[in-house]
Amino acid sequence: MEPGSTPPNGSAPATPGTPAPLFSSGGPRVDSLSYERKSMPRCKCLPLPAVEGWGVATHTCVVEIPAPDVSLTRKLGAEFVGTFILIFFATAAPIVNQKYGGAISPFGNAACAGLAVATVILSTGHISGAHLNPSLTIAFAALRHFPWLQVPAYVAVQALASVCAAFALKGVFHPFLSGGVTVPDATVSTAQAFFTEFIISFNLLFVVTAVATDTRAVGELAGIAVGAAVTLNILVAGPTTGGSMNPVRTLGPAVAAGNYRQLWIYLLAPTLGALAGASVYKAVKLRDENGETPRTQRSFRR
């Protein structure tokens, strides 16, 4: 592979805690010009304030180690498992709450979804990026943080995992209760439901874009930050729209229950909100001092 060329498979999205190999699979070579630049750590020297008495400014070096390549098949497998876990537990909580007379409470519903998101990000983020959400995948592709060629496969796997999780719930909690389906409350107009889903999706993607694509954000806390955003959104929007923020959170349970009421809201509003939230963060984020552009493929970083 020539220096500067693009590898056949995109680099795995970065996630807290897992270092990558320093050299390519062929191993290091002896001569100093033979190392592949893609496999070498990237160093950036940042100026620090001058030390009193020394009269010179000091510098510190930040080393970025590239993540190893992950095949698309492995990414899709991890994305399927992660989305399945999210939909199963985020949908199970309101079903249990309905079946057992409020045993979990609205806060429990929100916390269950937030914990599921945090768990999946920390366990699969280093493999697939833990998108779990077609709106997120589309927004990242639109902002050049994810390759468009992989979007159809990711969205298809997310939708399939959602349907599988919903039918698994239907088998566990037979008959499938309406509590797991996200539909607008009878007291909420169509416009209000649409705007609510737009706003909470905006909030979610603003946070996700910050912790997943900005090198100055604390990537090690990505799962906690995103899980907290999901919990907050469901606490606010749960009573009115169910707090979906995710087309496949609504799609799978709708198919299992045969309830497609106002489904278009949950397909369109989260996607538009995600695009807006990610775009706004990109507009307000601090620019790199060396003028570097965003990497082609980023998600929850190591």
Curated annotation (Swiss-Prot):
Record motif NPA 1, residues: 133-135
A GO molecular-function descriptor: arsenite transmembrane transporter activity
Motif interval(s): NPA 2: 246-248
One of the GO biological process terms: cellular response to boron-containing substance levels
Chain segments annotated as transmembrane: 76-96, 102-122, 149-169, 193-213, 217-237, 264-284
Domain notes: Aquaporins contain two tandem repeats each containing three membrane-spanning domains and a pore-forming loop with the signature motif Asn-Pro-Ala (NPA).
Function: Aquaporins facilitate the transport of water and small neutral solutes across cell membranes.
Designated name of the protein: Aquaporin NIP3-1
Taxon lineage: Eukaryota, Viridiplantae, Streptophyta, Embryophyta, Tracheophyta
Gene: NIP3-1
